[in-house]
């Protein structure tokens, strides 16, 4: 049989073309020391800051301290299977998390892996966790309202899309409740919500997820959970993972609301990491860059200009104080970074004023320009009225013989406090808020006993739904304040049918 040279060369050519070299060159190091979620690695001379490295058992680590003789790596997972002398490989990748629509309705860990038992997440797109914040020229000033559904906030400390508004207060004062209520109020508003739970009990996270599911809010919400039992590197990374998922939507022209619950625990996790990495401690044993830890996170919340699609990320960071001390290190840092704060007071909470917002110390530095005209007009004097009531209240304790003007101020103040009370998980549409605040400021509640105020409001809302729909629709659709005559007619009509308690 004759051997044909063409056939042999064609065969060889196809073999060469299909040949795949299995050999790859990777930078390899050795574990010198391991413990408390930190590994010291020798030999990774070319590793980048923030690069992922892979241990022999598949667990990933994050390169943090780049020193002459070794690299300090924080381990993103269980470290019990890693021992001294183990091999460590560079991956050449910085940390990334999956992003996209597929994450909506899911509960994931800070690495973007599902932890809700509902199967894998089929997304192919990823984004780097650490990213420079949007530049000044790509932004636009805050001018669209983000309605929380909470009267005391929408009237006194309004929030706009693209704003960073801090929620600060002692433990058990209703901080998470405000955040969850705000998420519930975004239903049908076209806002995607991201709830980042940092260092909370698993049972607490589960309860919040169930609350969102029952209200139908998981249809537009992503939950990123790093519970108290997770290693501290995951608690440190969780907020950055959350905002990275949010940026994907923002750059596609959508509106995002992100809640960090809470950044005090993230700062504590970062302090733990820094001390284990032998970085020099500063005030309250925090490292020197704890301000940068939060500023680079919160600066990623923005309102993009119209050329970039006009998307936004609104951030609601939560900070827990000790005994109301807002002058501690982390609270003062975050207050200076954000565009205002909602200060919750335990004294108010325990006296039955819920949400326990201290109107005097709560501010919104940019939200005023985003507030709808109707609310701005009816709630204009509300803060001053509340402040003068608090002042008169303490003054009135010393004597009962008050002049008529002071007595009327006190009575109006009591009704103002009652109107601003609200049950949890019951956000109120803005048109109903405008209606009750108008009734309050125009004196329609002055002859209603204080004990009846809540019932008056509930019944007014039900009555208005069927008898004053035009009025409510006008506020909802235009944002402007209808004629006073329409309000007066509606409220007077309702008062005829309202029965006061004896």
From Swiss-Prot:
Lineage: superkingdom: Bacteria
Major subcellular site: membrane
EC class (word): translocase
One GO cellular component term: proton-transporting ATP synthase complex
Coiled-coil regions, chain positions: none
Location in or out of the cell: Cell membrane
Record-marked site positions (Required for activity): 362
Binding sites annotated in the UniProt record for ATP: 169-176
Reaction equation(s) it catalyzes: ATP + H2O + 4 H(+)(in) = ADP + phosphate + 5 H(+)(out)
Any Gene Ontology biological process: proton motive force-driven ATP synthesis
Bilayer topology: Peripheral membrane protein
MF GO annotations: ADP binding; ATP binding; proton-transporting ATP synthase activity, rotational mechanism
PROSITE patterns associated with the record: ATPASE_ALPHA_BETA
Pfam families: ATP-synt_ab, ATP-synt_ab_C, ATP-synt_ab_N
Gene3D superfamilies: 2.40.30.20, ATP synthase alpha/beta chain, C-terminal domain, P-loop containing nucleotide triphosphate hydrolases
Keywords for this protein: ATP synthesis, ATP-binding, Cell membrane, CF(1), Hydrogen ion transport, Ion transport, Membrane, Nucleotide-binding, Translocase, Transport
EC number annotated for this UniProt entry: 7.1.2.2
Subunit text: F-type ATPases have 2 components, CF(1) - the catalytic core - and CF(0) - the membrane proton channel. CF(1) has five subunits: alpha(3), beta(3), gamma(1), delta(1), epsilon(1). CF(0) has three main subunits: a(1), b(2) and c(9-12). The alpha and beta chains form an alternating ring which encloses part of the gamma chain. CF(1) is attached to CF(0) by a central stalk formed by the gamma and epsilon chains, while a peripheral stalk is formed by the delta and b chains.
Function of the protein: Produces ATP from ADP in the presence of a proton gradient across the membrane. The alpha chain is a regulatory subunit.
Protein family membership: Belongs to the ATPase alpha/beta chains family.
HAMAP family, alphabetized: ATP_synth_alpha_bact (MF_01346)
Protein name: ATP synthase subunit alpha
Organism (species): Staphylococcus aureus (strain NCTC 8325 / PS 47)
